[in-house]
Amino acid sequence: PSQDIGIFNSADLIIAHTEPMRQWLIDHGVKTPIVLLHIFDYYSEDDFLPVDDIVARHNEVVFAGNLRKSEFLPALCRHPFSGLTFNLYGLKGDIDFSSYPHIKYCGVFQGDHTGTIHGGWGLVWDGDSITTCDGVLGDYLRYNLPHKLSLYIAAGLPVIVWSQSAVAD
């Protein structure tokens, strides 16, 4: 809305997450100088996960975050993945993962202790589908820089991202 653009234009400087976010702001009338964040820093008291541990867990995908807002999780649970396990970290609410052998709920971890995350890959995903990031939250990944990307990198995990997300490049 134009009121938001007016607020942005009254600032001295804007820090945008990504180039697509910067371009969206410009396309919608922001005249204030914009710099790019590129990626969040992430503090961890732990070292990278040992490479041998990551390689040994090549068939385990980590997803960390607010599981209650992750609308794709029911579809992920229902889809049988042969030889692949998803290690979920975060607040789960009333979701019951116990009847899905490829889903492992690992609880909540302390954010500054990335060494307690176990898996071979980190997943950056949103929306209600497992084949594409759709809906409002999924579409936002076209512009957003999710903090979980920095978490996975701080843990030493390679990441899986949607090909159309702002962080795919």
Describe each region flagged by the PLM.
Residues 15, 35-37, 87, 123, ...:
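Hydrophobic/aromatic beta-strand patches that form the interior of the parallel beta-sheet core
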Residues 28-41, 157:
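P-loop/Walker A phosphate-binding loop and immediately adjacent motor/lid segment at beta-alpha junctions
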Residues 18-22, 88-96, 108-110, 128, ...:
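Short, polar loop motifs at secondary-structure junctions
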Residues 42-118:
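Conserved catalytic-core segment of nucleotide-activated headgroup transferases in glycan assembly
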Residues 114-155, 161-168:
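Nucleotide-sugar-dependent
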